[in-house]
Amino acid sequence: MGKVRPTFVKRPAREIVEKYEEYLTTDFEHNKKVVEIVARPKTKKLRNMIAGYVTHLMRLKERQREEGTE
């Protein structure tokens, strides 16, 4: 089973994906830099948690696109 992420991670991550989807990828390191620029989280840990969830959401979107084309 995976981790349960709190609302203070999910909400900003969803907003970032909604507004800046064209700048995001499935690469955590790249998303970490985007989150740092866009959201300015207070701590590194929070930045990484948000970037991790953003990466998760982007992978889900990619899978949905692939399944939709088959």
From Swiss-Prot:
Organism: Methanopyrus kandleri (strain AV19 / DSM 6324 / JCM 9639 / NBRC 100938)
Matching PANTHER family: 40S RIBOSOMAL PROTEIN S17 (PTHR10732:SF0)
The keyword Ribosomal protein appears for this protein: yes
InterPro entries per record: Ribosomal_eS17, Ribosomal_eS17_CS, Ribosomal_eS17_sf
Keyword 4Fe-4S assigned: no
Protein's name in the database: Small ribosomal subunit protein eS17
Biological classification of the source: Archaea, Methanobacteriati, Methanobacteriota, Methanomada group, Methanopyri
One Gene Ontology molecular-function label: structural constituent of ribosome
Record-linked NCBIfam families: PRK01151.1
Disulfide bonds: none
Keywords tagged on the record: Ribonucleoprotein, Ribosomal protein
Family, per entry: Belongs to the eukaryotic ribosomal protein eS17 family.
Transmembrane portions of the chain: none
